[in-house]
Amino acid sequence: MSEATIDSMLKDLPFPSNILNTLREDVLKAGVSKKEMEEIIEKMMEEYATSCIEPCDAAGVVAAQSIGEPGTQMTMRTFHYAGVAEINVTLGLPRLIEIVDARKIPSTPMMTIALSKEHPEDYAYDREKTRALAWEIEATKIDHIADVTTDLSQMKLIIDLHEKAMEGRNITIDQVKEKFNEELNVLVSISPDIDNQIVITPGEPSYRELLQLAKSIHNVTLKGIEGIKRVVVRKEGEEYTLYTEGSALRDVLQFEGVDKTRTSTNNINEIYEVLGIEAARNAIIKEATDTLREQGLTVDIRHIMLVADLMTCDGEVKQIGRHGISGEKASVFARAAFEVTVNHLLDAGMRGDVDQLQGVTENIIVGQPIRMGTGDVHLISRRVEKVEAKELEAEEE
């Protein structure tokens, strides 16, 4: 059987991608016929039907233990070289905690910038274009292109620009001067005697002002995007890709040559702000799955999807914690059982809250059967024949 035939037969099957990929590889190795393939698929569908979730099953508890148990095997290492020698990225348990805590800014924000590749001369295939785009995106500070010295006798800052560094980053002395004029309330002038030298004089001739100014000029972004500390060009297969240390999705998507459909960031809140809640949900699933897979752990994607759905179901990204999902539960006992127990009970008592005892935690606390499995099944009516039989027995007596 050809690969195209196998793909067409597997296309509409309701199985996770990792199972389909394994099946595809095994079928190609074994060289099965079309009839045998149909029998394999039929057997798989039978197994699939028997493995579906039972009514009233505790899906949330199963998801929690399915993610939590592999989580105990994850390493505590924070940094790892993600195939790019110059860029560190947080992985393992610290990264998983960041994802479920919905941190506003990850500890190592990073972007993967895919480049346009529709035509042979596009950015993805041209190293020079890619390198030029990298310099446009990377934040250029004065330290990258110049030496700064403080002249205390003249009360001035002297900036000696490096011509080669300026050429590489495609920036001119006039642009540097203009940027300092915009950002700082000082007198900026180009030295008439020495090439590529800028002289900055503070507004007030005092040592304090001069030292403050010497500190401030290092924070001015002369070119590129604020927050993108470094950009690395890497060739993957036939095309070039950019990896950044720092993240600014909205700004990066504005650049010509960036493929908007394939560019991503590991900052989930930024994805939510730029692309919306559905994109954020997909990012949570992808980041959690990739983090677990990198550690050699396989968790069924449906458990992770359940967590992602819960974090995004209200239209914004919420953490799983007392400031998010756990702190917003309707049940007083469920909130109290998680964290800051006394505060929750006191507040509920003052407000006169009523707990309907619908969930698992609150029923366990008060000693009632939980509403899961057989505990969630109630007798609604009795069969008429049995009722009539009992009535006849009562009459005979």
From Swiss-Prot:
Name listed for the protein in its UniProt record: DNA-directed RNA polymerase subunit Rpo1C
Superkingdom of origin organism: Archaea
Top-rank EC class of the record's enzyme: transferase
Keywords: Cytoplasm, DNA-binding, DNA-directed RNA polymerase, Nucleotidyltransferase, Transcription, Transferase
EC number(s) recorded for this UniProt protein: 2.7.7.6
Organism of derivation: Methanosarcina acetivorans (strain ATCC 35395 / DSM 2834 / JCM 12185 / C2A)
Gene (UniProt): rpo1C
Listed NCBIfam families: RNA_pol_rpoA2
Gene Ontology biological-process entries: DNA-templated transcription
Keyword Cytoplasm in annotation: yes
Gene3D superfamilies xrefs: 1.10.150.390
One of the record's GO molecular function terms: DNA binding
Quaternary structure and interacting proteins, as annotated: Part of the RNA polymerase complex.
A GO CC annotation given for this chain: cytoplasm
Principal location class: cytoplasm
Family: Belongs to the RNA polymerase beta' chain family.
UniProt catalytic activity: RNA(n) + a ribonucleoside 5'-triphosphate = RNA(n+1) + diphosphate
Subcellular location: Cytoplasm
